[in-house]
Amino acid sequence: MPNPSMLRIGYHVSIAGSIWLAFKRAYSIGCTTMQIFTGNPRGWDFSNVPAQDANRFVSESKKFDIKPVFAHMPYLPNLASANDAVYAKSTKALQSAIDNCATLGIRYLVMHLGSHLGRGRSFGLSRIESAINSVSSRGVTLLLENEAGQRNAMGSSLEELAEVYDAIGAREKGFCIDTCHAFAAGYDIRKPEVLDKVINALGKANIRLVHLNDAKFGLGSHLDRHESIGKGHIGDDGISKVLHAFAGKPFIMETPWKSDAESRAELRHVVQLAR
């Protein structure tokens, strides 16, 4: 049974105003880990975090017991794209995010693998491999996130995730398992034997982060729609099994927006489920 006092649990937190404010926001709702974007998540933003903000971020990181800090790639990049212009911008966005992580002292960057847009798995794998192997790691660990099984999406199956992991060579790398995505892709993580399958396929040591999200739609829906903990189709019992199976790993929630009070209550609820 996991020790709730050792549980690293938090949210994806806004960086509105300035990136260093994320620590105070995370602390105010009880986070002991957090995830952020390092820039505009909805645009092609290749800018570096201003030095003054980066220095303040590093300073704030020493004031709070909020660790590890994870960054997430923005929404637009598609490293499996057949469109050369999009592919080039996506690769540039990956390097920019890595550079910002290195400047901020963030060790982990979560990334989606993208969509091959009908060109096939082999094509998508080749594009992803080339993109990742072309960028400088700067000591930042890339965490490959599983997908929900959407049409043409790369990384929905455990086998595909492992294939990409093996293809990108000797660099800092690992996995981020999203519970909603896994459930939507057809993995019934409410069952201990399925959780064991996930762990055995990817290697427990390689799984560095769990995105702890309930699922708005049913098993195998292929719909990426997160739900608040206990209010979706995975449910409290399923979430509890996930917490126990991945004991010792950090958990980040990306559940629907709620007030600070509601976020604190949800976080406390998760701690209870971990007992």
Segment roles from a protein language model:
Residues A26, H72, S90, C101, ...:
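Conserved, mostly hydrophobic/aromatic
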Residues I132-E227:
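Acidic/histidine-rich catalytic cores of soluble enzymes
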